[in-house]
Amino acid sequence: MPSVFIKTFGCQMNVRDSEQVLQDFIERGYQIASSEKWADIILINTCSVRAMAEEKAIDKLASLKTAKKKNPNLVLGIIGCMAQNRGREIAEKYRFVDLVLGTQKFHKVAEIADNLLKNPDRSSSYVDLSKEEAAHNAINKHLSTKAQPIAYVSIMQGCSMHCSFCIVPTTRGEERSRPIDEIFEEVKRLAETSVKEIVLLGQIVNRYGAKEFPWVKGKSPFVQLLEKLSTIEEIKRIRFTSPHPLGFKEDLIAALRDIPQLCEHVHLPVQSGSDKILKAMRRGYSRSKFLSLVDKLRKAIPQLALSTDIIVGYPGETEEDFQQTCSLLNEVRFDNAFIFRYSAREGTTAASLGDQLSEEVKFERNYRLLEIQNKITMEKAQKWVGQVVEILVEGESKKNASKFQGRTRTNHLVIIPKNERWRGEFLPVRIVETTGHTFYGTPLISGIDEALQFDLQEEINPAPIVS
């Protein structure tokens, strides 16, 4: 039986795309290799949002040249965002690559790679970066090899916002949304398995259907979708990522308040606290409008947890601009923040701007902002210690397989002792300790000692929120 291995870089949408590709291979009689060493086909699903992500993928590709020499019949492919953006360059420079497919070809990866494996006489790379009508509708399969309580559902592809720093409209194309009924049927199928929570995915997820579907009775297509999915009884939690502040109209705020399945967590990317930088980024809102939105959300959902994305070192960012971002963090007090150093992306407006900041300045500002946020994160996390929360137990902790992990409705990660009876179940847990980014808890169920403690030192320290 032939085998396939996929190394995935980047966001959750890339992970979801890889899942689709793997399931297509399974349906063709392949098995998923546990390591690239055992694979007949090796694919790298790539990311282009920052230079570091591309560098990691290129390094991985270069490291596989030896494997290709040892086994010329090995099929080696590059797929995803970097393939879309730099595919022909990659095929020309790395001639040992057999396959380069863009972001609108995920549904064809298995077929093409399988044909290449059956044809060892390959004279050149197979490259296809073309657009394909309705390709966004094809990301609808989930791995049949393992049951999970949480499933990610792609509801749209692409982005039409064209922020000045962002390469996504180039790599993913303009936004295209799947029909509500198709998404509903996909989630119904998931609900018939072990899935209890779904996470809806889109580059700008709350712009779902903006071009394709009408508002009905004052409700956007996205809210219509949320309401329909909430009727599936087995689905107890619904999340979505990643939204844009401009997409939070009154109907969505009301839905967050009124639909019980919608979790009390919103990821709200602000990117900067400076009006000058926000305008240069083409974000479409001011600092004051963002703060007003935060106020509306918190008034509607008092238990709401907020996370955000921030870019430091955008071209032309002065110390005063940076201080405005620092003050915004202190004013909003996000539960978590993902802080990134600006990375110039060729072809974007920001990459051609003057006054590009040095890497030294970017690193220094990144560090200072991270210090502020880490302090806020710890202060907010400490307030949860001693409280009882409900978690959905996902399975083994990513940092320590001898423990289980789960998440609260507010998206806080909780580590608990491992017990197979709890896998995939909702569990009441008392929070006994926190590192800020991670909570540690004691399950509160019949026959379990509430005072049960376990060695926190066994856990590997959680990764910092900056990447």
UniProtKB/Swiss-Prot annotation:
Gene3D superfamilies: Methylthiotransferase, N-terminal domain, tm_1862 like domain. The keyword rRNA processing does not apply. Pfam families: Radical_SAM, TRAM, UPF0004. Residues 382-445 form the TRAM domain. Binds 2 [4Fe-4S] clusters. One cluster is coordinated with 3 cysteines and an exchangeable S-adenosyl-L-methionine. Residues 145-379 form the Radical SAM core domain. NCBIfam families: miaB-methiolase, MiaB/RimO family radical SAM methylthiotransferase. This is tRNA-2-methylthio-N(6)-dimethylallyladenosine synthase. The lineage of its organism: Bacteria, Pseudomonadati, Verrucomicrobiota, Methylacidiphilae, Methylacidiphilales. The gene is miaB.
